[in-house]
Amino acid sequence: MEEELKSFVKVWGSAIISVSYCYYIPSKIKSGVHRLLSVLPVCVLFLVLPLFFVFTIFSSTTAFCLSILANFKLILFAFDKGPLLPLPANLFRFICFTCLPIKIQKNPNSQNHLPKWVFFCKAAIFGVLLNVHNYKSSLPPILLICLYPLHLYLVLDVLLTIVNALLTIILGCDLEPHFNEPYLATSLQDFWGRRWNLMVPAIFRPGVYHPMRSVCQPQMRSDWARFMGCWTTFFVSGLIHELVYFYINRETPTWEVTWFFVLQGVCTAMEKAVKRKTRWSLSPMLSRLITVGFLVVTGYFLFFRQIERSNMLERRATEASLIIDFVKHKLSNFLL
């Protein structure tokens, strides 16, 4: 455990030093290829850092924050785009907005904040799910299909909401929420674009969708250019998730996750095309059932099977227990 914490300090210390370099040096270079070349060594380093961990909690968190989000932010920053512009007022803010999955909320008064009791209900359900996983072997398959996506959503929503609340106090500014009640999505476009893990579409739109659409626009009809932009965005997302799975399991990719996102990209693009050409629509309740049902079923067979085979959730629970016991032991020694 101590070795893992030493690795944590070294990895994130290296990340802070690297981002500090980006704040003082590349930010002074003219945007474009030259600035991109100046940040590329940092991007390569961020791809390597998750490999220093054994615990999946640390490797997956570092991969998400540094290898994916921070790298995309820095590449967009090289071309004067993305969430790092305008340049934060000081180094501390630049480090936070680069290394952490946060973004300043542009219109804080326009957001419909849910009552606090909703968050506490989610936290309570998450606590129940942790105990339910102990009896996973005796649960019927139909229940497992719903259990995995619910667990993923709640663990991300609860933890990221807590992180957002703390950083809002520390930074003194309102931050964008990560989720917008995805279980209320009435379409795939609504789910992926406006409700699920909102930091990712905020980066993928300027980083993947718009460039791909611009490249395709002169070569094909606008409908097909939009389709290629949408499909490419989901394809890149699939490759990124395969990379995260590699950091966690250190195994050859199965490409199941990539196929999941390819399927989502094709279906989302087709859904958008149908909406533009017809006025046919379903009731909101039926739309929600179809959308969430499609995501849950396809997610179980293409996204969560790899998690199930690798016992990822059980490993993370064991690691969390080890970390808590280690902290308790150190605190008791310190106090005594």
UniProtKB/Swiss-Prot annotation:
Question: Lineage of this protein's species?
Answer: Eukaryota, Viridiplantae, Streptophyta, Embryophyta, Tracheophyta
Compartments (UniProt record): Membrane
- Reaction(s) this enzyme catalyzes, per UniProt: a long chain fatty alcohol + a fatty acyl-CoA = a wax ester + CoA
- Give GO terms for biological process: lipid metabolic process
From the Swiss-Prot or TrEMBL record, give the protein name. Probable long-chain-alcohol O-fatty-acyltransferase 8
Leading EC class: transferase
What this chain does, per the entry, is described as: Catalyzes the final step in the synthesis of long-chain linear esters (waxes).
User: Where does the UniProt entry say this protein principally localizes?
Assistant: membrane
Q: Name one GO cellular component term.
A: membrane
Q: Does the keyword Lipid metabolism apply?
A: yes
Give the matching InterPro entries. Wax_synthase, Wax_synthase_dom, Wax_synthase_Magnoliopsida
Output the Gene Ontology terms for molecular function: long-chain-alcohol O-fatty-acyltransferase activity
Q: What is its EC number?
A: 2.3.1.75
Q: What family is this?
A: Belongs to the wax synthase family.
Transmembrane helix found in the keyword field? yes
Q: Where are the transmembrane segments?
A: 7-27, 38-58, 59-79, 82-102, 117-135, 152-172, 228-248, 284-304
Annotated membrane topology: Multi-pass membrane protein
> What does the UniProt keyword field contain?
Acyltransferase, Lipid biosynthesis, Lipid metabolism, Membrane, Transferase, Transmembrane, Transmembrane helix
Pfam families in the record: MBOAT_2 (PF13813)
